[in-house]
Amino acid sequence: MAFQLSPGVVTSEVDLTTVVPAAGTTTGAFAGIFQWGPAELARQIESEVRLVEVFQKPDNNTAVSFFTCANFLTYGNDLRVVRAVNGVSTRTATASGNNTYLIKNEDQYFTSYYGANTGNTGAWVARYPGALGNSLKVSVWANTNQTHFDAWAYKNYFDAIPGTSSYVSAAGGANDEMHIVVVDEDGLFSGTTGTVLETYPFVSKASDAKDSVGNSNYYRDVIWRKSKYIYWTDHPDITNTYVTWGTTAAGKSFAHVPNVAAAHTVSLSSGADGTIVSGNVQTAYSKFIDADLIDVSLVMTGDADSATALYAINSIAESRKDCVVFVSPALANVTSATPADDVVNYRKNALSNVSSSYAVMDSGWKYQYDKYNDKYRWIPLNGDVAGLCARTDTETDPWFSPAGASRGSVKNVIKLAYYPAKADRDTLYKNGVNPVVSFAGEGTLLFGDKTMLSKPSAFDRINVRRLFIALEKAISRAAKAQLFEFNDEFTRSQFVSIVEPFLRTVKGRRGITDFKVVCDASNNTPDVVDRNEFIGDIYVKPNRSINFIQLNFVAVRSGVSFDEVVGRT
């Protein structure tokens, strides 16, 4: 407290209630190919319904990406998804048909297109890049001729003809209102041609117009705020409307679209999916690199090629050290005549025999039903294995193994591309590949819990790696409270008193068998203190999952006491 110069009472508070916070370990991450949705921007997806809403239904080009995500979401409910696009060949559909535009996401639109008339795109662009945007049509009614309004194809979607809003009327203006309709012209979004997707009644041409609750009613802002399908890029019929449209309301009589006998209707075109290559997918995965910006724990790779899988392992997991990457072999490896050898060769050659406790590899692909296209598809299992980890976190804790009959049951399996027999399982497992198997009466199971770490270590098991991720994330967050404090006995004691109760809880929940926290003058020497450093050493003995069971059945003669033979066989 400050020194007092005269008598008085000063009240102060000291907060010593710091605890180790909960650390998320169930958040999935994926980057891949989709028909729709923001590109190179992570979106949170909570369910398959939300996945369809944001990234649309799968087709033949996007099915593996879609179902990798959908499969994870059958086990967990927190997924970050990034869409990959090709900067050269992927294009955004425009009202003008100009095929040179790629507006990747909301951030790019707001920075480059929101505030200025572009001219070359026409009045509207699809909200997201891809050929799906070519299915969109926009119709605008912006005049007060009742007879002509009654003949407008979309008249019945509105209560009345547009006129003058109360806001503009109060400002001495007139004729600012307009109606906008967004139509699925080709039926690619809704399944039915001509379906009206969105309507925007009585929006304003005045840039400062407000609605009844004080939000902007300027039609550009309303479309930006509410539409799932389009962005504004210019005023319709710019030659005749630019003088008044987009100006303030005071004293303005806003221009009609000149041809009062018709609405201003335009179909978007020139959208293209492009050819997505490995580098594009890696660019999408790069959005997960910074642990300070985005928190993820379970990174799936779908059917990504080996270069992309290695990028995810080396540039994301090994860099962040707070997440695990899940990979599968190529479909060709598990449908060959020698699948065990081919999967191991993929592990050793294509994946460069990478050694990392932050990576997990499974043995194959599954056959599952695609309800959106009424067909069956082969899908890699890494989305399911990551999902099993998420489900394990929810039902128990991250330090439990996700494998086996209790927690390793794989969902939505018609059949496996490869059923590894015992000899094959031995070959796969000693090379760090976790077999996925089917047993009669038990279903399809993840039957291994190894990481891709090559050397013998506690960290060559998934549960131990994820235990340490959980401990490190939680305790490091608690340690931030010690930043800029003094490195003295009080601060060290406070740190120990924060960490030890947390570790006792983990021990009680079977994550560790014992622990010790050292944070005193023995490791915070005067030299450490003078370097403005603070050291806490945390020793733990992790619990180990059972991988091998031996059952000994011993026949004993009648009249022989069991005490005589127990321990001697």
PLM region descriptions:
Residues V140-W224, K228:
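Beta-strand-rich solenoidal segments
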Residues M1-K104, Q108-A116, G122-R127, A171-N175, ...:
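Structured, hydrophobic secondary-structure cores that serve as assembly/anchoring elements
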Residues S12-E13, G97-D107, L132-S169, C519-A521:
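Charged, amphipathic alpha-helical segments
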